[in-house]
């Protein structure tokens, strides 16, 4: 609101009149969705309203009221700022200041978000020379009312001072900096329709640059000048129209300026475009795919246009650097360029050859505008005949099999849509978002991220990131089979049905068509089928159980398959979201790999031999720490076989050293240390067992912001609980060594209390989880041996969730034997091994499942 006195009745009447007219326009837009008409009508409505206020303020005819920025362009979105310039003559009466201030205040009273400046012509030119943002807004200045002569003088002086080359350089730099803020990708979960790469601002930037250079101010004019083709002009207009419509609809839905396509509005925005949910895809996912395709096209065409404008503003001082392929390609200033516009039409096989040359030629850093345009206009050439051409299939395999440059080549193939033209099923998942609370990338971006992760394992400069993976891939023959598996592992997402099974068929067809040897083809197809198997076994099953390992080893079959699956699994999890991977998951997978490898090598996965081996290793470690030879017996005699199978030798030794003097302790023993795997805290609890113990410990962790990754619960023969937890702090940059003592003292004190368990705190869900909640699921079943019951819980992640589950179990006096907490982005899939009287009773099972569903509901 303005800083002046309260609006007069007349001002309030005008405001109501303006609002009613605007509301009618927005209603027409809701019905007809003609965004150009809406923006023009809003601009005209605003013009007329400001003219009336200008006249009422009695401002002299020597001044001019000028619309600048988007308003000057005549493109007002429903709740955009209205940027105006009050243009003053060089000599003016200072007494005008009060009237100008009154004018601006009355403009605010209309309900407009006014952005105003008051300057002389000279001040405008000076400000523009210092600030490219001011220079840009003035580029589209339009007189609303006032002195025509003054405005024309401003226009002449402005264009005389405008340096097209300097403006180009500044705007391109500004665009790069803006893109960097959005991680240089249009594929954001919540893109900014205006500012993100491929958004409206990119289109505006091109037109600003072209206008400043005198090349035109519309796509039609750029087409006439030869900077773009008719087809490109149509594509630009079509995508610009979609983005403007989407932005306007966001404003209307939100009832305010809203340029971010946030989760909360994606479903409503999708419905406003007529999208409806299907069995395979949400309405929001369909809208986001349309948006990503538009942003991708804008990015591609913007690259072509900017290079073309640059070539005209900065004529090259040197021509061809070298010939790369006679009659096809040359290198020109570090860019791969076709020798003429008809290369791809004469030689369709040159399309894929371009990417092979880009990948293998040192010094080539990209494709020239001419090459990009030719690719863009070669879509009809990339047909079934082209896909089936043996030479093209050979070139595609050569691209996959190069020692370096693969990731960059495939990203460029995707950006130019060539990859989707060659692999039609890949085209189906380009821009497909997965609102599963797990993946934060579109399916095509996730696939390329997995490919990139596998490639990094093989690159020496990145060997320090995942040394074990780098070691394995260094000895893995024909690693390109992993790249093919990466390309196909999620290619069938969104089709309905099991994507692993559907993807197998696609992979099998690809291998057959590309002449891949039968043993390599079998591995590729198997990897696509089983790409989720290893993570499910490691994160959801009891890998201390020899039977689990034996079954997994039977599925894998041999070392090459195991290594391939391990490398693909690590790359896949790391490619879902920056938040999903952690060292604990890495440890689970590596342990499963090593144990399975031993079994494949002939080791017998029976409990007795494993028990003996771990005990011997633990005793050796205890001797190194000068623990008396037989001191361990007081504790070990009270432990069952399960304890020794659930913990490795180092863990057994640590717990023994802590507890051998306190086997019959009257008070709780709590010890904490930074987890040996890093990025976590290991907490040991030893105390007389009771039904609510697990829940009480979880309550403490919940209240103190500690998330449980893993829980291993044991009960001694003389009634003590020996529980181990791996926890992480929700705050970043925590030093676990610093909080270990605090956890020991506080948790030990908490365990002495006899107060009833507190009510769980239902922590607030993230916006993503609130917008795309998953249906909570609870499944309770007996294990294969009938010894325990397995409880599986799937729900939206939130603070307090684990404690809510534990409290229900405690109320029914059900003991938790083990817990595997699996957090997948915004979703949890937890597994509990339960023991308790009455669990075989169907009525108790139904009651338990009902109460758990109520406890985990959002």
Swiss-Prot record:
The keyword Heme does not apply. Keywords: Hydrolase, Magnesium, Multifunctional enzyme, Nitrogen fixation, Nucleotidyltransferase, Repeat, Transferase. Residues 682-761, 790-858 form the ACT domain. GO terms for molecular function: [protein-PII] uridylyltransferase activity; phosphoric diester hydrolase activity. Its cofactor is Mg(2+). One of its GO terms (biological process) is nitrogen fixation. Residues 443-565 form the HD domain. It catalyses: [protein-PII]-L-tyrosine + UTP = [protein-PII]-uridylyl-L-tyrosine + diphosphate; [protein-PII]-uridylyl-L-tyrosine + H2O = [protein-PII]-L-tyrosine + UMP + H(+). SUPFAM superfamilies: ACT-like, HD-domain/PDEase-like, Nucleotidyltransferase, Nucleotidyltransferase substrate binding subunit/domain. Gene3D superfamilies: 3.30.70.260, Beta Polymerase, domain 2, Hypothetical protein af1432, Nucleotidyltransferases domain 2. Residues 1-324 are annotated as: Uridylyltransferase. It comes from the Bacteria. InterPro entries: ACT-like_dom_sf, ACT_dom, HD/PDEase_dom, HD_domain, NT_sf, PII_UdlTrfase/GS_AdlTrfase, Polymerase_NTP_transf_dom, UTase/UR. The keyword Magnesium applies. Residues 325-681 are annotated as: Uridylyl-removing. Uridylyltransferase (UTase) activity is inhibited by glutamine, while glutamine activates uridylyl-removing (UR) activity. Pfam families: GlnD_UR_UTase (PF08335), HD (PF01966), NTP_transf_2 (PF01909). Its EC number is 2.7.7.59, 3.1.4.-. Has four distinct domains: an N-terminal nucleotidyltransferase (NT) domain responsible for UTase activity, a central HD domain that encodes UR activity, and two C-terminal ACT domains that seem to have a role in glutamine sensing. Belongs to the GlnD family. Modifies, by uridylylation and deuridylylation, the PII regulatory proteins (GlnB and homologs), in response to the nitrogen status of the cell that GlnD senses through the glutamine level. Under low glutamine levels, catalyzes the conversion of the PII proteins and UTP to PII-UMP and PPi, while under higher glutamine levels, GlnD hydrolyzes PII-UMP to PII and UMP (deuridylylation). Thus, controls uridylylation state and activity of the PII proteins, and plays an important role in the regulation of nitrogen fixation and metabolism. This is Bifunctional uridylyltransferase/uridylyl-removing enzyme. It comes from Burkholderia lata (strain ATCC 17760 / DSM 23089 / LMG 22485 / NCIMB 9086 / R18194 / 383). The lineage of its organism: Bacteria, Pseudomonadati, Pseudomonadota, Betaproteobacteria, Burkholderiales. The gene is glnD.
């Amino acid at each position: 609101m303005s800083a002046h006195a309260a609006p007069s009745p007349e001002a309030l009447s005008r405001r109501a009149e303006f609002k009613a007219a605007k509301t009618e326009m927005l209603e027409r837009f809701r019905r007809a969705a003609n965004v150009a008409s809406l923006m023009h009508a809003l601009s005209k409505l605003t013009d007329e309203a400001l003219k009336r206020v200008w006249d009422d303020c009695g401002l002299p005819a020597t001044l001019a009221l000028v619309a600048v920025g988007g308003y000057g362009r005549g493109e007002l979105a429903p709740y955009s700022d209205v940027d105006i310039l009050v243009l003053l003559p060089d000599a003016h009466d200072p007494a005008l200041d009060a009237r100008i201030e009154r004018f601006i205040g009355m403009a605010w009273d209309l309900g407009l978000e006014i952005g105003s400046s008051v300057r002389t012509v000279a001040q405008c030119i000076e400000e523009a020379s210092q600030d490219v943002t001011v220079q840009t807004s003035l580029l589209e200045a339009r007189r609303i009312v006032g002195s025509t002569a003054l405005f024309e003088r401003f226009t002449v002086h402005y264009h005389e001072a405008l340096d097209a080359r300097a403006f180009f350089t500044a705007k391109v730099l500004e665009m790069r900096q803006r893109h960097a803020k959005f991680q240089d990708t249009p594929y954001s979960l919540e893109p900014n329709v205006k500012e993100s790469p491929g958004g409206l601002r990119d289109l505006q930037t091109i037109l600003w640059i072209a206008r400043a250079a005198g090349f035109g101010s519309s796509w039609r004019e750029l087409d006439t000048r030869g900077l773009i083709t008719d087809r490109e002009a149509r594509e630009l207009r079509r995508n610009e129209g979609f983005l403007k419509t989407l932005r306007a609809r966001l404003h209307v839905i939100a009832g305010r300026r809203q340029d971010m396509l946030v989760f909360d509005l994606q479903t409503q925005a999708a419905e406003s475009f007529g999208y409806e949910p299907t069995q395979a895809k949400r309405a929001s996912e369909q809208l986001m795919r349309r948006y990503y395709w538009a942003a991708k096209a804008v990015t591609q065409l913007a690259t072509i246009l900017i290079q073309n404008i640059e070539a005209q503003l900065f004529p090259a001082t040197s021509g061809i650097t070298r010939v790369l392929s006679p009659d096809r390609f040359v290198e020109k200033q570090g860019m791969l360029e076709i020798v003429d516009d008809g290369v791809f039409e004469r030689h369709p096989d040159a399309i894929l050859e371009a990417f092979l040359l880009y990948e293998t030629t040192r010094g080539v850093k990209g494709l020239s505008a001419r090459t990009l345009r030719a690719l863009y206009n070669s879509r009809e050439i990339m047909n079934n005949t082209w896909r089936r051409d043996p030479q093209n299939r050979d070139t595609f395999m050569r691209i996959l099999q190069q020692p370096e440059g693969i990731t960059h080549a495939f990203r460029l193939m995707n950006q130019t849509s060539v990859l989707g033209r060659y692999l039609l099923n890949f085209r189906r998942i380009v821009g497909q978002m997965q609102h599963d609370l797990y993946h934060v990338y579109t399916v095509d971006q996730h696939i390329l991220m997995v490919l990139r992760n596998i490639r990094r394992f093989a690159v020496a400069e990145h060997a320090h990131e995942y040394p074990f993976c780098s070691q394995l891939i260094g000895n893995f023959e024909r690693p390109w089979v992993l790249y093919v598996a990466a390309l196909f592992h999620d290619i069938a997402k969104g089709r309905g049905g099991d994507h692993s099974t559907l993807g197998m068929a696609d992979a099998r067809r690809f291998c057959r068509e590309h002449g891949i040897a039968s043993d390599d083809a079998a591995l590729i197809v198997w990897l696509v089928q089983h790409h989720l198997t290893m993570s499910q076994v490691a994160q959801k099953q009891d890998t201390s159980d020899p039977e689990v390992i034996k079954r997994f080893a039977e599925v894998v079959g041999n070392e090459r398959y195991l290594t391939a699956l391990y490398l693909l699994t690590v790359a896949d999890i790391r490619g879902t979201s920056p938040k999903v991977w952690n060292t604990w998951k890495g440890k689970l997978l590596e342990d499963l790999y090593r144990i399975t490898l031993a079994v494949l090598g002939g080791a017998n996965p029976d409990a007795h031999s494993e028990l003996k081996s771990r005990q011997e290793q633990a005793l050796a470690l205890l001797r190194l720490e000068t623990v008396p030879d037989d001191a361990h017996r007081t504790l070990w005699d009270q432990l069952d076989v399960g304890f020794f199978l659930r913990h490795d030798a180092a863990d057994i030794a640590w717990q023994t050293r802590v507890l051998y003097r306190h086997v019959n302790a009257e008070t709780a023993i709590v010890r904490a240390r930074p987890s040996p795997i890093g990025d976590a805290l290991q907490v040991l609890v030893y105390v007389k067992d009771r039904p609510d113990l697990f829940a009480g410990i979880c309550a403490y962790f919940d209240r103190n912001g500690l998330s449980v990754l893993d829980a291993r619960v044991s009960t001694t023969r003389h009634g003590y609980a020996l529980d181990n937890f791996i926890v992480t702090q929700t705050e970043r940059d925590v030093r676990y060594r610093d909080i270990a003592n605090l956890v020991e003292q506080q948790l030990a004190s908490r365990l002495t209390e006899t107060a009833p368990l507190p009510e769980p705190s239902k922590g607030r869900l993230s916006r993503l989880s609130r917008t795309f909640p998953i249906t909570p699921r609870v499944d309770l079943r007996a294990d294969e041996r009938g010894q325990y019951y397995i409880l599986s819980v799937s729900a939206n992640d939130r603070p307090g969730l684990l404690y809510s589950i534990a409290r229900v179990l405690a109320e029914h006096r059900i003991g938790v034997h083990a817990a595997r907490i699996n957090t997948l982005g915004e979703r949890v899939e937890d597994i509990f091994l339960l023991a308790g009287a009455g669990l075989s009773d169907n009525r108790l099972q139904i009651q338990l499942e009902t109460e758990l569903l109520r406890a985990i509901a959002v």
